[in-house]
Every structure is written in C-alpha cells, then in structure tokens.
C-alpha cells in the first residue's frame, strides 16, 4: 500500500512532470489557451501514458534491451494513433483545436521517460498506476494554467466545453467578467510562460511551507515531555 501511495503522490505532486521535471513544455505552453483544450490534451496524454506503461511493462521480459527504445516508440505511436482516431471520431471540434499536438504526444519526453524509468522495471498494475498518476499530474497543471489564461484573457471558463464533452456541456460555460476585447498577453505564448512561472513559484512556496511544518513537528516530537523548546 505504501508503494502505491508513493507512486500516486510522486506523479501528482512531488515529481510532477510539468512543475518539477519540466517535461512536455511545448504542448503545455501551446495548447493551454483555454481550460477545455488543456483538459482535452491532458486526458489524451493520461490515456496514452496509462496504456503504454501497461503494454511496455507486460512485454518487458520479451523486449531485447539493445532495441528497446525503438520498440517503445512503436508502441507509443500505435497507442497515440488509436487515441487520435478516437478524438477525431467523437470530439471532432477538440481534434481540430488541438491539431498537430495530438500526434506529437509520440515525441513527448514524459511518455518515453516513464517507459524507460518505470514501466520497463515494474509490474503491469503498478506501471499503469504510474502512467495514470503522471498523466493526471500533467493534466492538473495544464488545466490550472489553461483556466488562468482563459479567465484573464477572455473572462470566461470552459468556453467550448461542448467540443470535448458534447452539446450538453454548453451549460458549463461561465462568464467571470465581460470584456469586449481579449487580453492578448494572457492568450499568447508569453502569457503561458508567465503563468507557468507563477505556478512554479507557487509550488515552491507550498513545498517550503510544508517542509517547515514537518521540521517543526519533528522537533516538537523530539523534545522531552513538558518542554516547549522556548528559552
């Protein structure tokens, strides 16, 4: 159970692919102009990570080490192609919006990195969980960045959600504030870099605060009964 918890915590927070490893920044910065686009690509990446980790882990004993990387890429490309066709069939609006960034999941360092670092060494169930956790960590980072950029840039949230979830999702659109002209800095790549920088700073501050609390708690436990540590 502790290993399962560690895999989940590492993927979602401690070893977050976007905020710690800084992998896959090209789609992270390019696609997160809206929360819907960010969520769509994040979920697609999560599905690819889960399936590729599961497949690579299952076949790890029959994969020659000398040619393992080309085999990994072939497996990843096959899964990405299947996911791309699914999005094209059931979410065509999202497919048009994401464009080239769906097939570019094949070259995403996150996917190849988890295949080599984890799936090739661990069992199928734990590898699938690792892929799901890493993918959801990246999805959360994309969604937060996309939401911030959409709110600041257009004053809306979940604009175009029907492209991802169907016509019923039009009711999810929220207008935070009305604007006649969008704030282009937030919608363009410079806004993505600024937003990512703020998120990195926020994560650092949270980690430092949590570290300080753990240190103080450990110091209090180490004190003899009745002592407070004050002079």
UniProtKB/Swiss-Prot annotation:
Listed A to Z, the keywords are:
Cell inner membrane, Cell membrane, Electron transport, Membrane, Translocase, Transmembrane, Transmembrane helix, Transport
Ranges annotated as spanning the membrane: 18-38, 39-59, 63-83, 86-106, 125-145, 182-202
Q: Where in the cell is it found?
A: Cell inner membrane
| Family named by the database record | Belongs to the NqrDE/RnfAE family.
Q: What is this protein called?
A: Ion-translocating oxidoreductase complex subunit E
Identify the EC number(s): 7.-.-.-
Q: Which organism is it from?
A: Escherichia coli O6:K15:H31 (strain 536 / UPEC)
InterPro entries in alphabetical order:
NqrDE/RnfAE, RnfE
Coding gene?
rsxE
């Amino acid at each position: 159970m502790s290993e399962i918890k560690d895999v989940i915590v590492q993927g979602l927070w401690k070893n977050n692919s976007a905020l710690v490893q800084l992998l896959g920044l090209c789609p992270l910065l390019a696609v997160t102009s809206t929360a819907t686009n960010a969520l769509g690509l994040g979920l697609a990446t999560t599905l690819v990570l889960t399936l590729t980790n599961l497949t690579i882990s299952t076949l790890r004993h029959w994969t020659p080490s000398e040619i393992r990387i080309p085999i990994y890429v072939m497996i990843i490309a096959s899964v990405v192609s299947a996911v791309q066709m699914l999005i094209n069939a059931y979410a065509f609006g999202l497919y048009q919006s994401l464009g080239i960034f769906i097939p570019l999941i094949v070259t995403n360092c996150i996917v190849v990195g988890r295949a080599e670092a984890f799936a090739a060494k661990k069992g199928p169930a734990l590898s699938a969980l690792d892929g799901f956790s890493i993918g959801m960590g990246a999805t959360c980072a994309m969604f937060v960045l996309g939401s911030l950029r959409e709110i600041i840039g257009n004053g809306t949230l979940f604009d175009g959600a029907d492209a991802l979830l169907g016509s019923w999702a039009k009711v999810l659109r929220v207008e935070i504030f009305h604007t006649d002209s969008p704030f282009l800095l937030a919608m363009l790549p410079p806004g993505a870099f600024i937003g990512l920088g703020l998120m990195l700073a926020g994560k650092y501050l949270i980690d430092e605060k949590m570290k300080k609390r753990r240190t103080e708690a450990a110091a209090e436990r180490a004190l003899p009964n009745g002592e407070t540590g004050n002079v």
